[in-house]
């Protein structure tokens, strides 16, 4: 069978080469048809406000149905190979534009106003969820409740299954309207969560391959090297691009093509630089997106700003939709190991427990550091807990684990992850709208403007901390508040030094001019997008 799939004989055989080209054409045509169907169906569902089948769920279903039909009809192998989910293709071509757009579309005001909470949920919370899941899976195996895996492999599974994909929840937020703080928490946590999960998985994989001489301290050091190094590479590339566009004088009419080409190349430069340094390209391109939107974007001409915003939004939408179709087709075509149903059942139970430990534990810590008027209400914490759907990132890492782990172990993890992804995307994703309305965190009462939610400046945050009585012995709470103050100090540093240095705005951080106008073009917090038209 493998000899039939080799390309080299077809090169010398005109008929074989023609057959390969025909199979490629049919495969790509089917993919395009599924993309068109997915976008049209998503539009119809949005137009009729049918929230029980979100766009991501519809795309996954289309892939599952077409893949099932191809499997039943014994579609020709050369055509089916065009639908195989390759983790290299996913990580090199599909994921980078999605992650970059996540960072590029961040709104600076809500993100930095909730920066401490977002970092707590995404970094500490993801670490807690990974460790809790891995430990529970290991204990479940020891107690003969489920298929037993070695401890490090359990931690690898905990890391990959902690990668959340709340695209369904965010789309419903956009349709129904949501509290600005809640949207910022869910979106910000999801952006950094993927980067954290990938770094944890790669660290655990490295520990497994070099198990001798490793200890917990070295694991933490290796993880910090990967994460901080990748973040530094991304931020460095972003700042370099900002200075280039500030001083190169490209924002003139006859150089707009060059301006846009250079801007589009920088994200992939950041990604490949990190990968070449054995770091995480996903972490790097994420922070490149954040920095380029905050600094480089304002150095572009008005026409180039409109083009790059539309371009990255376009390719990320195509990639995201294609990923769910691609994933659904591959799930239907792959041979899964369903012999360990106990592993699947208890894994689902354990990730629910781990997600609760993540959200409610971190929520408690964040509320310790916040004044009364800034505490995260329990309804928001429940919504954040419910939004922890698993998606393409967990699926891709699980597929990679099939190659990283011994035969049987990786296949068991892949099958369990597949079941979890399908369950969360279809069932939980379909009930998200009802759940959010029951919690009363969406609706017209939450359609507040972006500025209304963040009028309190950093000095008022700091004053509220100083004025509150601090009971004796609350040193931990004091340290948490110092961390929150550092976020406010960074905002002041950005306003007074970084923005004037890296942009041509001369420090006009909060004015209603060009920079703020383009930041607010993509505000997702209202039902009908009428926020920018307010009087």
UniProtKB/Swiss-Prot annotation:
Location in or out of the cell: Endosome membrane; Golgi apparatus, Golgi stack membrane; Golgi apparatus, trans-Golgi network membrane
Region annotated Disordered, chain positions: 508-535
Spans through the membrane: 25-45, 50-70, 127-147, 149-169, 180-200, 216-236, 272-292, 307-327, 341-361, 383-402, 413-433
Pfam families assigned to the protein according to its UniProt record, in alphabetical order: Na_H_Exchanger
GO cellular component, one term: endosome
Phosphothreonine sites (modified residues): 470
Reaction(s) catalysed (UniProt annotation): Na(+)(in) + H(+)(out) = Na(+)(out) + H(+)(in); K(+)(in) + H(+)(out) = K(+)(out) + H(+)(in)
Major site of localization recorded for this protein: membrane
Lumenal-facing ranges: 46-49, 148, 201-215, 293-306, 362-382, 434-535
Sites where a glycan is attached: 299
GO term, biological process aspect, one: regulation of pH
Intramembrane region ranges (chain numbering): 88-108
Molecular function terms from GO: sodium:proton antiporter activity
Membrane topology term: Multi-pass membrane protein
Ranges per topology, Cytoplasmic: 1-24, 71-87, 109-126, 170-179, 237-271, 328-340, 403-412
The entry's keywords: Antiport, Endosome, Glycoprotein, Golgi apparatus, Ion transport, Membrane, Phosphoprotein, Potassium, Potassium transport, Sodium, Sodium transport, Transmembrane, Transmembrane helix, Transport
Outcome of gene disruption: No visible phenotype; due to redundancy with NHX5. Nhx5 and nhx6 double mutant has a slower development, is drastically smaller and is salt sensitive.
Protein family according to the UniProt entry: Belongs to the monovalent cation:proton antiporter 1 (CPA1) transporter (TC 2.A.36) family.
NCBIfam families for the chain: b_cpa1
This protein's name: Sodium/hydrogen exchanger 6
Name of the encoding gene: NHX6
């Amino acid at each position: 069978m493998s000899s039939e799939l080799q390309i080299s004989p077809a090169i010398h055989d005109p008929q074989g080469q023609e057959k390969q080209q025909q199979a490629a054409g049919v495969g790509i045509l089917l993919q395009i048809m599924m993309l068109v169907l997915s976008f049209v169906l998503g539009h119809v569902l949005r137009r009729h406000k049918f929230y029980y089948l979100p766009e991501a769920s519809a795309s996954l279903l289309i892939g599952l149905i077409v893949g099932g039909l191809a499997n039943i009809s014994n579609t020709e192998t050369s055509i089916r190979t065009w639908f195989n989910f390759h983790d290299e293709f996913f990580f090199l071509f599909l994921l980078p534009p999605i992650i970059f757009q996540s960072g590029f579309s961040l709104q600076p005001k809500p993100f930095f106003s909730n920066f401490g909470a977002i970092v707590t949920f995404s970094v500490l919370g993801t670490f807690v969820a990974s460790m809790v899941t891995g430990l529970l899976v290991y204990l479940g195996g020891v107690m003969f409740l489920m298929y037993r895996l070695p401890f490090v492999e359990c931690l690898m599974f905990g890391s990959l299954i902690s990668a959340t994909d709340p695209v369904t929840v965010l789309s419903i937020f956009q349709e129904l309207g949501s509290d600005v703080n809640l949207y910022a928490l869910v979106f910000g946590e999801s952006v950094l969560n993927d980067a954290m999960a990938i770094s944890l998985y790669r660290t655990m994989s490295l520990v497994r391959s070099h198990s001798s001489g490793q200890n917990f301290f070295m694991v933490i050091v290796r993880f910090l090297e990967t994460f901080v190094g990748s973040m530094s590479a991304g931020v460095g590339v972003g700042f370099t691009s900002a200075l280039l566009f500030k001083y190169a004088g490209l924002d003139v009419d006859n150089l707009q093509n060059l301006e846009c080409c250079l801007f589009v190349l920088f994200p992939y430069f950041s990604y490949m630089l990190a990968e070449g340094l054995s770091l995480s390209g996903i972490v790097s391109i994420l922070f490149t997106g954040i920095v380029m939107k905050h600094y480089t974007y304002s150095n572009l001409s008005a026409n180039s700003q409109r083009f790059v915003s539309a371009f990255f939004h376009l390719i990320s939408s195509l990639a995201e939709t294609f990923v769910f179709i691609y994933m659904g087709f591959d799930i239907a075509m792959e041979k899964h190991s369903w012999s360990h149903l106990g592993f699947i059942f208890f894994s689902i139970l354990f990730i629910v427990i781990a997600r609760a430990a993540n959200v409610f534990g971190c929520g408690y810590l964040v509320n310790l550091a916040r004044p009364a008027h800034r505490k995260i209400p329990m309804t928001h914490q429940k919504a954040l807990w419910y939004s922890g759907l698993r998606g393409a990132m967990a699926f891709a890492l699980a597929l990679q684990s099939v190659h990283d782990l011994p035969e049987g172990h990786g296949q068991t993890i892949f099958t369990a992850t597949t079941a979890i992804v399908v369950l969360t995307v279809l069932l939980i994703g379909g009930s998200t709208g009802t759940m959010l309305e029951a919690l009363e965190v969406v609706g017209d009462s939450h359609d507040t403007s972006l500025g209304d939610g963040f009028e309190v400046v950093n000095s008022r945050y700091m004053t509220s901390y100083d004025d509150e009585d601090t009971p004796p012995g609350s040193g931990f709470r004091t340290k948490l508040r110092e961390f929150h103050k550092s976020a406010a100090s960074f905002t002041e540093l950005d306003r007074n030094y970084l923005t004037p240095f890296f942009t041509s705005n001369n420090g006009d951080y909060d004015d209603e001019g060009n920079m703020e106008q383009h930041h607010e073009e993509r505000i997702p917090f209202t039902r009908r997008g009428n926020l920018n038209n307010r009087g």
